[in-house]
Amino acid sequence: PAIEPEAVAEVMADLIREGKILHWGISETTEEYLRRAHRVCPVTAIQNRYSMMVRRHETSFPVLEELGVGFVAFSPLANGLLSNRYTAETTFDPATDYRASMPQYRRESFVKNRPLFALLERLADEHRATASQISLAWMMNKRSWIVPIPGTRCLCRLKENIGATDIRLSAEEVRAIDAELDTIEMSEVFGGSPIIEKPKTEGE
Protein backbone atom coordinates (compact mmCIF):
# COMPACT_ATOMS: atom_id res chain seq x y z
CA PRO A 1 0.00 0.00 0.00
CA ALA A 2 1.08 3.59 -0.64
CA ILE A 3 2.51 5.35 2.40
CA GLU A 4 1.82 9.04 2.91
CA PRO A 5 4.91 11.27 2.63
CA GLU A 6 4.29 12.67 6.11
CA ALA A 7 4.53 9.19 7.60
CA VAL A 8 7.80 8.49 5.80
CA ALA A 9 9.22 11.86 6.83
CA GLU A 10 8.31 11.24 10.48
CA VAL A 11 10.31 8.01 10.42
CA MET A 12 13.27 9.82 8.86
CA ALA A 13 13.02 12.53 11.55
CA ASP A 14 13.10 9.85 14.25
CA LEU A 15 16.17 8.24 12.69
CA ILE A 16 17.94 11.60 12.56
CA ARG A 17 17.12 12.33 16.21
CA GLU A 18 18.44 8.90 17.15
CA GLY A 19 21.67 9.61 15.27
CA LYS A 20 21.17 6.69 12.90
CA ILE A 21 21.19 8.84 9.76
CA LEU A 22 22.36 12.37 9.03
CA HIS A 23 20.34 13.19 5.92
CA TRP A 24 17.66 11.71 3.76
CA GLY A 25 16.46 11.99 0.20
CA ILE A 26 13.69 10.93 -2.16
CA SER A 27 14.14 9.22 -5.50
CA GLU A 28 11.91 10.04 -8.49
CA THR A 29 9.50 12.22 -6.59
CA THR A 30 6.81 14.74 -7.45
CA GLU A 31 6.61 18.33 -6.23
CA GLU A 32 3.59 17.57 -4.05
CA TYR A 33 5.27 14.60 -2.38
CA LEU A 34 8.45 16.62 -1.80
CA ARG A 35 6.64 19.58 -0.25
CA ARG A 36 4.57 17.41 2.06
CA ALA A 37 7.58 15.41 3.23
CA HIS A 38 9.78 18.49 3.57
CA ARG A 39 7.29 20.17 5.92
CA VAL A 40 7.70 17.30 8.38
CA CYS A 41 11.44 16.64 8.01
CA PRO A 42 13.65 18.76 5.73
CA VAL A 43 14.73 16.76 2.67
CA THR A 44 18.43 16.95 1.84
CA ALA A 45 18.20 15.99 -1.84
CA ILE A 46 16.06 14.35 -4.46
CA GLN A 47 17.39 11.94 -7.07
CA ASN A 48 16.08 11.86 -10.62
CA ARG A 49 17.25 10.86 -14.07
CA TYR A 50 18.78 13.91 -15.75
CA SER A 51 20.98 14.43 -18.79
CA MET A 52 21.16 16.44 -21.99
CA MET A 53 18.64 13.93 -23.36
CA VAL A 54 16.27 13.87 -20.37
CA ARG A 55 15.59 17.39 -19.09
CA ARG A 56 11.99 17.23 -17.92
CA HIS A 57 12.98 17.59 -14.26
CA GLU A 58 14.29 21.10 -14.89
CA THR A 59 10.74 22.20 -14.08
CA SER A 60 11.43 21.21 -10.46
CA PHE A 61 14.49 23.47 -10.12
CA PRO A 62 12.57 26.52 -8.79
CA VAL A 63 11.01 24.39 -6.05
CA LEU A 64 14.37 22.92 -5.10
CA GLU A 65 15.87 26.40 -4.84
CA GLU A 66 12.93 27.56 -2.76
CA LEU A 67 13.27 24.67 -0.30
CA GLY A 68 17.06 24.44 -0.33
CA VAL A 69 17.01 20.85 -1.60
CA GLY A 70 19.82 19.37 -3.70
CA PHE A 71 19.43 17.42 -6.93
CA VAL A 72 21.29 14.15 -7.49
CA ALA A 73 21.33 13.37 -11.21
CA PHE A 74 21.51 9.69 -12.06
CA SER A 75 22.26 8.46 -15.57
CA PRO A 76 23.80 11.86 -16.45
CA LEU A 77 25.42 10.37 -19.55
CA ALA A 78 22.23 8.70 -20.80
CA ASN A 79 23.63 5.28 -19.93
CA GLY A 80 26.93 6.09 -21.58
CA LEU A 81 25.67 7.42 -24.90
CA LEU A 82 26.78 10.99 -24.18
CA SER A 83 30.37 9.83 -23.80
CA ASN A 84 30.27 9.79 -27.62
CA ARG A 85 32.39 6.63 -27.64
CA TYR A 86 29.83 4.42 -29.34
CA THR A 87 28.67 4.13 -32.94
CA ALA A 88 25.86 2.51 -34.88
CA GLU A 89 28.11 -0.52 -35.21
CA THR A 90 28.35 -0.99 -31.44
CA THR A 91 26.61 -4.08 -30.12
CA PHE A 92 25.93 -5.27 -26.59
CA ASP A 93 25.31 -8.79 -25.34
CA PRO A 94 21.66 -8.85 -24.21
CA ALA A 95 22.52 -11.55 -21.68
CA THR A 96 24.97 -9.35 -19.81
CA ASP A 97 24.41 -5.72 -20.83
CA TYR A 98 21.04 -4.01 -20.47
CA ARG A 99 22.04 -1.36 -23.01
CA ALA A 100 21.26 -3.92 -25.71
CA SER A 101 17.57 -3.08 -25.31
CA MET A 102 17.86 0.68 -24.82
CA PRO A 103 16.33 2.79 -27.60
CA GLN A 104 19.18 5.30 -27.74
CA TYR A 105 21.53 2.51 -28.86
CA ARG A 106 19.48 1.49 -31.89
CA ARG A 107 21.17 2.03 -35.24
CA GLU A 108 18.62 4.62 -36.33
CA SER A 109 19.10 6.51 -33.07
CA PHE A 110 22.74 7.20 -33.86
CA VAL A 111 21.65 8.80 -37.13
CA LYS A 112 19.02 10.93 -35.42
CA ASN A 113 21.40 12.00 -32.65
CA ARG A 114 24.16 13.24 -34.97
CA PRO A 115 23.44 16.91 -34.17
CA LEU A 116 23.75 16.15 -30.46
CA PHE A 117 27.05 14.35 -30.97
CA ALA A 118 28.29 17.25 -33.08
CA LEU A 119 27.44 19.68 -30.29
CA LEU A 120 29.35 17.58 -27.78
CA GLU A 121 32.36 17.32 -30.08
CA ARG A 122 32.45 21.07 -30.66
CA LEU A 123 32.21 21.88 -26.95
CA ALA A 124 34.80 19.26 -26.09
CA ASP A 125 37.23 20.78 -28.60
CA GLU A 126 36.60 24.29 -27.28
CA HIS A 127 37.29 23.27 -23.69
CA ARG A 128 39.94 20.63 -24.37
CA ALA A 129 37.77 18.07 -22.68
CA THR A 130 35.90 14.87 -23.47
CA ALA A 131 32.23 14.58 -24.36
CA SER A 132 31.57 12.95 -20.99
CA GLN A 133 33.21 15.82 -19.15
CA ILE A 134 31.18 18.37 -21.09
CA SER A 135 27.94 16.53 -20.34
CA LEU A 136 28.73 16.53 -16.62
CA ALA A 137 30.13 20.06 -16.49
CA TRP A 138 27.03 21.41 -18.24
CA MET A 139 24.76 20.35 -15.39
CA MET A 140 27.20 21.15 -12.58
CA ASN A 141 27.65 24.68 -13.91
CA LYS A 142 23.91 25.06 -14.34
CA ARG A 143 23.25 24.89 -10.58
CA SER A 144 25.75 24.50 -7.76
CA TRP A 145 23.46 22.02 -6.01
CA ILE A 146 23.26 19.55 -8.91
CA VAL A 147 25.41 16.49 -8.26
CA PRO A 148 25.72 13.96 -11.12
CA ILE A 149 26.49 10.36 -10.25
CA PRO A 150 27.82 8.69 -13.41
CA GLY A 151 28.55 4.99 -13.25
CA THR A 152 31.85 3.52 -14.36
CA ARG A 153 33.60 0.18 -14.58
CA CYS A 154 37.21 1.35 -14.69
CA LEU A 155 39.52 3.75 -12.89
CA CYS A 156 40.39 5.70 -16.03
CA ARG A 157 36.74 6.65 -16.57
CA LEU A 158 36.40 7.62 -12.91
CA LYS A 159 39.35 10.00 -13.28
CA GLU A 160 37.87 11.35 -16.50
CA ASN A 161 34.56 12.05 -14.78
CA ILE A 162 36.28 13.79 -11.88
CA GLY A 163 38.02 16.01 -14.42
CA ALA A 164 34.64 17.52 -15.29
CA THR A 165 34.79 19.50 -12.04
CA ASP A 166 37.65 21.56 -13.49
CA ILE A 167 35.57 22.81 -16.42
CA ARG A 168 34.02 26.24 -15.95
CA LEU A 169 31.09 27.27 -18.11
CA SER A 170 29.64 30.75 -17.76
CA ALA A 171 25.92 31.27 -17.24
CA GLU A 172 25.79 32.59 -20.80
CA GLU A 173 27.48 29.45 -22.13
CA VAL A 174 25.05 27.21 -20.24
CA ARG A 175 22.08 29.15 -21.61
CA ALA A 176 23.49 28.88 -25.13
CA ILE A 177 23.91 25.11 -24.75
CA ASP A 178 20.35 24.82 -23.44
CA ALA A 179 19.05 26.85 -26.37
CA GLU A 180 20.86 24.61 -28.83
CA LEU A 181 19.62 21.46 -27.08
CA ASP A 182 16.09 22.83 -27.40
CA THR A 183 16.45 22.85 -31.18
CA ILE A 184 17.83 19.32 -31.51
CA GLU A 185 15.37 16.54 -32.28
CA MET A 186 16.76 13.56 -30.39
CA SER A 187 15.97 9.87 -30.41
CA GLU A 188 13.94 8.10 -27.80
CA VAL A 189 16.00 7.46 -24.69
CA PHE A 190 15.70 4.96 -21.86
CA GLY A 191 13.96 6.53 -18.88
CA GLY A 192 12.14 9.11 -20.92
CA SER A 193 8.79 8.20 -19.38
CA PRO A 194 6.87 10.48 -16.96
CA ILE A 195 7.86 10.82 -13.31
CA ILE A 196 7.14 7.75 -11.21
CA GLU A 197 4.31 8.58 -8.85
CA LYS A 198 5.39 6.40 -5.93
CA PRO A 199 8.78 7.68 -4.73
CA LYS A 200 11.38 5.56 -3.03
CA THR A 201 13.10 6.87 0.08
CA GLU A 202 16.78 6.78 0.84
CA GLY A 203 18.47 7.19 4.21
CA GLU A 204 22.15 7.44 5.02
Where does each model-flagged region fall?
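Beta/alpha (TIM)-barrel catalytic core signal, keyed to glycine-rich beta->alpha loops juxtaposed to Asp/Glu
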Residues: P1-I184, E197-E204
